[in-house]
Amino acid sequence: MELLQYTFFQHALIGSLLASIACGLIGTYIVTRRLVFISGGLTHASFGGIGLGLYTGISPILSAALFAVLSAFGVEWLSKRKDMREDSAIAVFWTLGMALGIMFTFLSPGFAPDLSAYLFGNILTITWSDIALLGGLALLLILFFAMYLHPIIYVAFDREFARSQGIPVQVFEYVLMMFIALTIVACLRMVGIVLVISLLTVPQMTDNLFSHRFHRIIWLSIGIGYLSCLGGLMISFYLNVPSGASIIFFSIIIYAICKTGKSFWLYLQR
């Protein structure tokens, strides 16, 4: 294909694969543990780090990662307190991150920075440094899940049972929250703050239509996630629309087709 001759498209293909691996792994934990709302809160909280990076002149991705991880730990800690509900803790960091992001952005010296790359993403503009970040994260997640798959499953499905088996539940929860935060930040350049949560949940929702086994959902999520990225890339390139939106749109089309197909199949089995 002619597209494969372009360096930016090669970068997009590699980045899509690495992002699909990372999102397939940690996204399965998110959906199984029902942490979608928390992940959405961390996504918007990371905007505070982006604003801080633009204001101080450091890498916005680096500051967003630091802000997201600290917010993840803060949500995890506050949600365990008896005087604070989990949704309230999420709201605190969600709104704090957005407020700080807006303030720091307006205080940034010089011309007003272009935030569209962080809000909506553009996978066609990712660089080797973005690919290296995604690759390092994907490798860490592969190693962590390979070494501790069963404890992760226990923590995801039944915290009390995991604790009865001697598993340090709180340690795993904090580590996995850190990985959620880092995955969100690593994918910002691809689909942006507005849509990154869909990349972590829609493929898993599609897989849940056909399987409830944790490891099978991981593999299917990686495949569907990558297929969504490829389809979204084609739509983005030929229609000249934002790649982040087209990737999520294509993934939801896949979900709708699978959902309709399964419903029709079950209807025929009556």
Outline where the language-model segments fall.
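Membrane-interfacial amphipathic/re-entrant helices at transmembrane-helix boundaries
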Residues: M1-I21, Q269
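Hydrophobic alpha-helical transmembrane segments
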Residues: L13-L18, I61-L66, A91-V92, I131-G136, ...
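Small-residue-rich segments of transmembrane alpha-helices in multi-pass membrane proteins
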Residues: A45-Y55, F93-T105, T125, V169-Y174, ...
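Helix-loop-helix "hairpin" substructures at the membrane interface of multi-pass membrane proteins
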Residues: D130-P203
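Transmembrane alpha-helical segments in multi-pass inner-membrane proteins
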Residues: M190, V194-A245
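Cytosolic-side transmembrane-helix boundaries in multi-pass membrane proteins
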Residues: V241-I248, I252-R270
